[in-house]
């Protein structure tokens, strides 16, 4: 049921959805089942099956938690509330290296014959490794201080955050192209009236 799925998402803490989005999507939820017999669905399914197979067959020696903690420290230290170009570039390289090491050296116990919590966590951390790199790439692209994020190169002489509405009055949407470093930026301009 939809209620059970919603509870699973909340319990899993994998999805964050602002309250206002529910109303926005309400009409779309009632559109009925979406057909999955398109080639894109089959390709996505094959990619996931291959990823699961590779994770389970990998004979690494490091836990998923090992990688999760390292990624968290990279994001916290180099892509947190206060950011600068040097550390963002370092974060991107470190995350790329961490992701490569993850796929080479992670150990995921169990099988895919039934629900496997370590496998689910490994898949989640694999997503976080991609999202973390894209997060740093997006922060590197946006060279202004805005909202709760302080770009050290974009501040007044008094040390206050300095916005750049001339160049950054847009919403960023990144198109997945395979790996985060090749993601394509799409800008949706904002106009306030």
Q: Where are the language model's segments positioned?
A:
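Glycine- and aromatic-enriched mobile tails/lids
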Residues: 4-7, 11-193
């Amino acid at each position: 049921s939809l209620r059970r799925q919603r509870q699973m998402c909340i319990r899993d803490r994998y999805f964050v959805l602002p309250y206002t989005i529910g109303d926005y999507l309400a009409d779309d939820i009632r559109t009925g089942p979406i057909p999955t017999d398109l080639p894109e669905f089959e390709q996505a399914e094959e990619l996931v099956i291959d990823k699961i197979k590779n994770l389970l067959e990998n004979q690494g020696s490091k836990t998923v938690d090992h990688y999760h903690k390292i990624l968290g420290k990279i994001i916290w230290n180099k892509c947190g509330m206060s950011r600068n170009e040097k550390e963002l570039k370092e974060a991107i390289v470190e995350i790329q290296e961490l992701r490569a090491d993850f796929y080479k050296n992670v150990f995921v116990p169990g099988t895919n014959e039934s629900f496997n919590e370590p496998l689910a966590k490994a898949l989640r951390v694999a997503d976080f490794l991609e999202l973390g790199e894209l997060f740093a790439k997006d922060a590197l692209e946006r060279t202004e201080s805005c909202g709760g994020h302080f770009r050290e190169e974009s501040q007044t002489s008094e040390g206050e955050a300095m916005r750049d509405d001339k160049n950054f009055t847009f919403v960023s949407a990144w198109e997945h192209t395979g790996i985060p470093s090749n993601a394509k930026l799409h800008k949706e301009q904002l106009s306030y009236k």
